Amino acid sequence: MSNPNDKEAFRAWAHEQMQAMAKHLKSRSLIDKDEVKIEARWNYPYRILLAEAWGVKSAHEKFWVIAGDVPVDHIESGLALDARAALKHFALRWQMQGARVKSADRDVTPDMQHSKLRVNWSEVGDTLAEKAEFIYALADDERNWESTMRM
């Protein structure tokens, strides 16, 4: 992990996360052929970047986007009033998705998988649940919401 006081290294890391966010939104056609505007709202240095994003031509459609040591993901901005609420929303969503993925793994037999690639969905579900617990703990800890942690 880089030095938390190295502003240049942090800017480079944050820029990389914002590029991943823009790619995520464009790949899902949420922002179509439009310049993506991304503004960081909160970070846990070198681990989590939470931002609001929108298209320059479609500023009325905003999204909360998360990236870093977690899956790049988004929610509509109306689902959370602030960064802390957005982080909690992602945590709940990932908990539910993790449980759903794990339960689906029990229902899939090897003969049902047409690909030679075998995915351990139980492990995927566990990983998603771990990420959810991590970000919920960050959202729940008052120390993470002091002004020194905001961008």
Which residues make up each language-model segment?
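Hydrophobic, Leu/Ile/Phe/Ala-enriched alpha-helical segments that form helix-helix packing faces
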Residues: 17-29, 90, 94, 135, ...
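Low-complexity, intrinsically disordered regions in eukaryotic regulatory proteins
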Residues: 66-72, 96-100, 104-105
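Alpha-helix boundary/N-cap detector
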Residues: 5-12, 16, 81, 85, ...
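N-terminal "first-domain core" detector
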Residues: 1-44
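Compact, glycine/acidic-enriched structural inserts
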Residues: 80-102
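Acidic, proline/glycine-rich low-complexity IDRs
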Residues: 2, 99, 103-151
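Short aromatic-glycine-(Arg/Gly/Cys) micro-motifs in beta-strand/loop hairpins
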Residues: 40-75
